[in-house]
């Protein structure tokens, strides 16, 4: 039951955030009653308290970027670390191309 209650409260919270309405326990409970979903009385208040002071829209937007709520200073080292990774990918592609050529030289082609 608690998994369904948690999910229902999450959806109700997302509905409120999408409509730019403050997330409170009463409003979550109102949406749950309108949807005919029964949850234990402490769930709506718990979710409202957990989301208090959090900008949920920014959180959802940043999930795709992989940064999350990291401070702005933390982004520079991540970008610097990405450069060597890109170089290693280029090296892997070169090695892969070389290995493809070596297979051709051996005469084991599919249609030879």
Swiss-Prot record:
One of its GO terms (biological process) is cytoplasmic translation. Residues 80-112 are annotated as: Disordered. GO terms for cellular component: cytosolic large ribosomal subunit; cytosolic ribosome. The modification Phosphoserine is found at residues 99, 102. Pfam families: Ribosomal_60s. InterPro entries: P1/P2_N_sf, Ribosomal_P1/P2. Residues 87-97 have a biased composition (Basic and acidic residues). Keywords: Phosphoprotein, Ribonucleoprotein, Ribosomal protein. GO terms for molecular function: protein kinase activator activity; ribonucleoprotein complex binding; structural constituent of ribosome. P1 and P2 exist as dimers at the large ribosomal subunit. Plays an important role in the elongation step of protein synthesis. Belongs to the eukaryotic ribosomal protein P1/P2 family. This is Large ribosomal subunit protein P1.
